[in-house]
Amino acid sequence: MPNKLLSANATVPQWDRHNLVPRIVHLGFGAFHRAHQAVYADVLAAEHSSDWGYIEVNLIGGEQQIADLKCQDFLYTVAEMSASAWSGRVVGVVRQALHAQVDGTEAVLEALCQPQVAIVSLTITEKGYCHAPATGELMRDHPLIVADLAQPHQPHSAPGIIVEALARRRAAGLAAFSVMSCDNIPENGRVIAGVVCAYARQCD
């Protein structure tokens, strides 16, 4: 990206992006993640030589976001504006981008099974957890869950994909990754733990 196309108020990566290791797979490449989590990782890379990079994944919807990211060498810009000023940051910590319905679920599972992946973070909205909000329990009659339980090695739901990836890692002798829900829902950690464990028990 020629710097002459950017405002002097824009911050661009001055560090070697090739040194990044994709240690985090993020499910749900939405605005909150783009403007906050990925920016924090970008600051760490710029100011503290962090090598933690992202693999961005959309499971359902957002096909154009992933397509655009691929066309832009996995770079995108976050703009901050006030009444008197504008600044931008070109975020450079993304190393790969996938869409489950475009690239295939198998490509997503392969990314999750890369040995260096340590964290799977999620901003998939409340609906993505396939749970009953009133109880926090997995909805076993949810269409995605029903389909995944019928074909557990070809999952489409977030719980199904996480469980299948963990099973493959265990079979390959790889350490499990940490699952980190970042959605704005009550007790998000308990919710993701509950639906993942409940789904895994159904698979057994």
Swiss-Prot record:
Keyword Cytoplasm among UniProt keywords: no
DNA-binding listed as a keyword: no
Q: Which residues bind NAD(+)?
A: 24-35
Q: List the disulfide bonds.
A: none
Q: What is its EC number?
A: 1.-.-.-
Any one Gene Ontology MF annotation carried by this entry is:
oxidoreductase activity, acting on the CH-OH group of donors, NAD or NADP as acceptor
InterPro entries on file: Mannitol_DH, Mannitol_DH/Oxidoreductase, Mannitol_DH_N, NAD(P)-bd_dom_sf
Keyword field: NAD, Oxidoreductase
- Write down the top EC class of this protein: oxidoreductase
Question: PANTHER family from the entry?
Answer: MANNITOL DEHYDROGENASE, MANNITOL DEHYDROGENASE DSF1-RELATED
Q: Which family does it belong to?
A: Belongs to the mannitol dehydrogenase family.
- Record-given protein name: Uncharacterized oxidoreductase in tutB 3'region
Give the organism, scientific name. Answer: Enterobacter agglomerans
